[in-house]
Amino acid sequence: MTEQRKEVVQRGLWFEEYEVGTAYLHRPGRTMTEADNVLFTTLTMNTQALHLDAAWAAEQPGFGGERLMNSMHTLSTLVGLSVAQLTQGTIVANLGFSEVSFPKPVLHGDTLYAETVCTDKRESKSRPGEGIVTLEHIGRNQHGDIVARAVRKTLVRKRPAGEETA
């Protein structure tokens, strides 16, 4: 007799699994490096000296002479840290961002920790089998300071018929 093994595929949450008010903590964090900053900044053609020119940045007031991490890299990493837990294989579309802010700088060597709060969800009026989920992504550094925040609307699949509940 052959024993059937249970297989579990890593995925994000189906629409029905999101709970408004729940905070999802995404671990591990990600330490931001100089290599990350230079690569992302040059790939995106952002020539801002605050990201690339160490000598120039050293003469600028306000950041202790250090170069800043590119804020778009910070935002991308913040969202990326949430993917495995929330949207891997279940998202249909990223509908947009609002209320994006970077209240404190991120510097080389800082570690970004992400958390996401589901702030709203509703069934799609035009796309049966899908729903709109509003997520607030919050990034904190290794000291617990909020360094990034963004509200994002996503279109998420509902649980397929016949799919087992966890």
Language-model-derived ranges and their functions:
Residues 1-20, 102-111, 115-166:
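HotDog/MaoC-like acyl-thioester-processing domains
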Residues 2-95, 158-166:
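Hot-dog-fold acyl-thioester-processing enzymes
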